[in-house]
Amino acid sequence: VTGANGNLGSATLAALRARGVAATGGSRMPGAGMRRLDFDDPTSLDLTEVSTLVLVSAGYAEDDQVVGRHAAVLDAAVRDGVRHVVYTSLTTAGDHLGFALAHRATERLVQAGGLPWTILRNGLYAELFGGLLRWSGSGVESPFGDGALAAVARADLADAAALVAADPARHSGRVHDLVGTPITAGQVADRLGVPHRTIGLGEYRRRLLEETPGLLSFQPPMLASIATGIRHGFLDGTTPDLTDLLGRPARDPLATAVAAASATRPKTSA
């Protein structure tokens, strides 16, 4: 499992081990029992004795760097005898998002690489949705308006990846679109017991550029595209793929988003 120190990678690794699957993680800064896998250092990409590779997207960069990283890992997988690749991609409904092209380009690489493959088109996290609400005075603000997001709890996506990786042949050549139940910013605010105020997309872009320190150059357009997609109803479609794969109901994305928003609540607003 690549990206094993990240949120999705670590949860996927834990889910595999909970199922009794012999699994190891790879990371640029590996913990105990992990392999060093630095996507920017091809000499570190040792995948010998790996039967199934769960390639967690290395999306925290510009598109060309992301695709280059993924290509290097996939080349190593072919070289070292990996027998199946599972790639965590982006939901089909996200084709218009600012970071979609790196995912679709990687899907092409996966499908053309000569190894059996499965693609998991993951919906946007409920944790992300809740975390993007901004506390202001006695309530929350967002650029989402009344638009809904078919959000997914990260833990469900980790469980889905573990299920596929534990029995990859069953899912060979398949693309699973893993989205959840549509939720709105207003619903999150209601659960929190506070009002929700919509801000314009132009104001949101201005805040990203002028009032949000620490963002890298690719992040403002990425976040703005998410806001536009949610606001105008491009990310609210759902499919049964997630629950069919899990064999159980999905975790409540609204409760997950509420918990994420609550975690950023200023003490003075409590």
Please tell me what each predicted stretch does.
Residues 8, 30-34:
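Short, charged/polar "capping" segments at the starts of alpha-helices
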Residues 189-233, 269-270:
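Terminal hydrophobic/aromatic helix or amphipathic segment near a protein terminus
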Residues 246-270:
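Amphipathic terminal alpha-helices
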Residues 23-31:
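Short, polar loop motifs at secondary-structure junctions
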